[in-house]
Swiss-Prot record:
<dbReference type="InterPro" id="IPR011060">
    <property type="entry name" value="RibuloseP-bd_barrel"/>
</dbReference>
<keyword id="KW-0368">Histidine biosynthesis</keyword>
<dbReference type="GO" id="GO:0005737">
    <property type="term" value="C:cytoplasm"/>
</dbReference>
<dbReference type="InterPro" id="IPR006062">
    <property type="entry name" value="His_biosynth"/>
</dbReference>
<feature type="active site" description="Proton acceptor">
    <location>
        <position position="8"/>
    </location>
</feature>
<dbReference type="InterPro" id="IPR044524">
    <property type="entry name" value="Isoase_HisA-like"/>
</dbReference>
<keyword id="KW-0028">Amino-acid biosynthesis</keyword>
<comment type="similarity">
    <text>Belongs to the HisA/HisF family.</text>
</comment>
<comment type="pathway">
    <text>Amino-acid biosynthesis; L-histidine biosynthesis; L-histidine from 5-phospho-alpha-D-ribose 1-diphosphate: step 4/9.</text>
</comment>
<dbReference type="GO" id="GO:0000162">
    <property type="term" value="P:L-tryptophan biosynthetic process"/>
</dbReference>
<keyword id="KW-0963">Cytoplasm</keyword>
<dbReference type="Pfam" id="PF00977">
    <property type="entry name" value="His_biosynth"/>
</dbReference>
<dbReference type="InterPro" id="IPR023016">
    <property type="entry name" value="Isoase_HisA-like_bact"/>
</dbReference>
<keyword id="KW-0413">Isomerase</keyword>
<dbReference type="GO" id="GO:0000105">
    <property type="term" value="P:L-histidine biosynthetic process"/>
</dbReference>
<dbReference type="GO" id="GO:0003949">
    <property type="term" value="F:1-(5-phosphoribosyl)-5-[(5-phosphoribosylamino)methylideneamino]imidazole-4-carboxamide isomerase activity"/>
</dbReference>
<protein>
    <recommendedName>
        <fullName>1-(5-phosphoribosyl)-5-[(5-phosphoribosylamino)methylideneamino] imidazole-4-carboxamide isomerase</fullName>
        <ecNumber>5.3.1.16</ecNumber>
    </recommendedName>
</protein>
Length: 249
């Protein structure tokens, strides 16, 4: 199991939003590259980056900064936000991003999404962002009217390599994860699932860990909690390693 430290980029700085609202932001760092290095030094095995400007505008905005982050790290980076065509995807992968997270076009343009998965096999994942059981698109401001169960078979058939599942109601709220919804998805999925939204404490990590042993849950993204100190990344990763080591004995 992996805890993915998150960097959300807006106007060139690291921010966290509450429930994805652009008007409810907290700036945590004015130096995203230094922040990325910090999370690597704290034991991060992956870095989760979101270009919020890109998500809201529908096109890449922070590409030079994202390249600088990739260049500064030895760990892989997964990126989402504003990736809505093959040219953008190719540019980010060539810039050093290991895998890409697609949201809007996966739901609104299924043929284009399937083509992306075919062109970059194993490197394209989908972001399923749910509020009240319905999936959102366009930076969480548009309602698709679809549910996870309705889209999952098509996404898997298209060649999705991994899934990020966000409970928007819990994102940035530090209220714990939606375990029933997450377990349902992780059991139904044939590819790795990563939880996002609500991971606030080590107890939340401990609650998720059993699912990583019995389902396709790969890990969880943590943002506000690791910035505000309610979850210590190194402590969480050490705890996970101890559990995995004990099970291997």
């Amino acid at each position: 199991m992996i805890v993915f430290p998150a960097i959300d980029l807006m106007n060139g700085v690291c921010v966290r939003l509450r429930r994805g609202r652009a008007d409810d932001e907290t700036v945590f760092s004015s130096d995203p590259v230094a922040t990325a290095r910090h999370w690597q030094e704290q034991g991060g095995r992956w870095l989760h980056v979101v270009d919020l400007d890109g998500a809201f505008s529908g096109q890449p905005v922070n590409a030079p900064l994202i390249r600088s982050i990739c260049d500064a790290l030895d760990i892989p980076v997964q990126l989402g936000g504003g990736i809505r065509d093959a040219a953008t995807a190719k540019a980010y992968l060539e810039a050093g991003v290991e895998r890409l997270i697609i949201g809007t076009i996966a739901l609104e343009e299924p043929d284009a999404y399937a083509a992306l998965c075919a062109e970059f096999p194993g490197r394209i994942g989908v972001s399923l962002d749910a509020e009240g059981g319905k999936l959102k698109t366009k930076g969480w401001v548009a309602d698709s009217g679809l549910t996870v169960d309705e889209v999952l078979p098509r996404l898997l058939e298209a060649g999705t390599a991994f899934i990020i599942y966000t409970d928007i109601d819990r994102d940035g709220m530090q209220t714990g994860v939606n375990l029933p919804a997450l377990e349902h998805l992780a059991k139904a999925s044939t590819v790795p699932v990563i939880a996002a939204g609500g991971v606030a404490t080590l107890e939340d990590v401990k609650a998720l860990y059993p699912l990583s042993r019995t389902t396709n849950l790969q890990g969880a993204v943590s943002g506000r909690a690791i910035y505000e100190g309610t979850l210590d990344l190194r402590t969480a990763m050490d705890w996970i390693r101890q559990q995995e080591k004990a099970e291997a004995c």
